[in-house]
């Protein structure tokens, strides 16, 4: 199934909110491709692309990650940020949301707080678990390459310009976000490489 969305999905009233059945236009049961009005890809769905072996190998570590939570993903969680209440009862200036089961694995780029690239804690503290994800990550990369070869090539070129210590070997990726049993709110990811494409 391929479909061109002629109208832009409105941000107002949706961003940060939860999906509702009334928002649905199509029920997709097989492979599908949706494109924006400008012809660029919005969504490519490939069912059954990952081998059972890679999925089964990765599952225990991915399941273990459900205990990793964040209180900093308001749009993703579908809940507004509020001031944190400290243990002593005082209101903090720090804005948080209720914890959602999400974490990042792979490698972080530089930021103001950390002016250097680095491994995520899960990579450095759980190298065996990280190793079990590698076949799955490589298979997702190959699905991406087959579905959107130009986007894959652009992302791969950017990865090759990055120090190899901070690229997931054999892929054009540096980082994975693992959202575990969380119903996402409408949101736009930040930090994605715009010439590439996000793979879920």
Give the ranges of each region predicted by the language model.
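Fe(II)/2-oxoglutarate oxygenase catalytic core
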Residues: 1-199
């Amino acid at each position: 199934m391929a479909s061109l969305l002629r109208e832009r999905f409105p941000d107002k009233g949706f961003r940060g909110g939860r999906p509702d059945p009334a928002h649905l236009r199509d029920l997709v049961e097989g492979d599908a491709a949706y494109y924006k009005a400008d012809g660029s890809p919005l969504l490519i769905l490939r069912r059954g692309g990952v081998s059972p072996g890679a999925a089964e190998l990765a599952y225990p570590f991915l399941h273990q990650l459900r205990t990793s939570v964040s209180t900093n993903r308001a749009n993703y969680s579908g809940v507004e940020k509020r001031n944190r209440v400290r243990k002593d009862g005082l209101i903090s200036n720090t804005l948080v949301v209720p914890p959602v089961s999400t974490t990042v694995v792979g490698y972080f780029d530089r930021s103001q707080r950390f002016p250097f690239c680095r491994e995520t804690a899960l990579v450095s503290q759980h190298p065996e678990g990280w190793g079990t994800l590698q076949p799955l990550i490589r298979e997702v990369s190959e699905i991406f390459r087959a579905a959107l070869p130009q986007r894959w090539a652009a992302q791969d070129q950017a990865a090759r310009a990055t120090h190899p210590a901070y690229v997931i070997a054999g892929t054009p990726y540096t980082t994975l976000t693992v959202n575990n049993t969380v119903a996402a709110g409408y949101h736009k990811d930040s930090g994605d490489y715009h010439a590439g494409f996000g793979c879920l």
